[in-house]
Amino acid sequence: DNFVILQQMVAIDRAQNRFELRASIQTLLRIIGSCTSSERVYIFDWDETDNVFRNSYEWCGDNVQPWIDNLQSVDSADMPYWLEAFERGDSMIIDNVEDVKDLMPSEYQLLVMQDIHSEIAFPIFYKDQLKGFIGVDNPHIDSSESFISLLGVVGGHLGNVRETLRMTELLEQRNNSLEKSLSDLNRERTFMSVLCTDYI
């Protein structure tokens, strides 16, 4: 199982654009879901400006209700315990949500609302900055240390790949803008040259 996840991480590395990356990440979520026999696997992006989490990716098992449309703006105030843990780089491993009812009451309400009984969640980082987290709902596995460590690696890797692609696309946009400006300038110079020739 671990090897299959690692293979998909290599595929994510090879993504050439945002569309390929999105498809590769979606496949990764499906693989994690299959390996853990879970009901749902998803990614939340952290919007530090608005202090909200936004559900950006979701994979659901058979006959499992999707929640992505309802989770586009989860206020950080509703996830204080998780946010603090993720910022420390800690993962969340919950074998039974009833055991954390008093420890994290806000998160408990969110989990119960989605019919979640057990949970694994781990942060996504880029250069020590929290970018979001990956969640695995109702997994049917033993939470082995090696597997949890692998999920942590996945979180860090996704953060790096997504940010690198974002910066690459931004650079390409700036280059295209610069090329257009130079083209417009050359066209204007040619036009002025023709005018001057006609005038003379």
Task: Give residue ranges: language-model regions.
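Signal-transmission linkers at sensory-effector interfaces
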Residues: 1-23, 34, 170-194, 198
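Short regulatory alpha-helical segment in sensory/regulatory domains of signaling proteins that mediates
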Residues: 10-20, 28-37, 43-48, 111-112, ...
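GAF sensory/regulatory domain recognition
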Residues: 30, 42-87, 129
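PAS/Per-ARNT-Sim sensory domains
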Residues: 77-81, 99-107, 173
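Signal-transducing coupling segments at domain and membrane junctions
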Residues: 95-118
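A short, aliphatic-rich beta-strand micro-motif
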Residues: 117-125
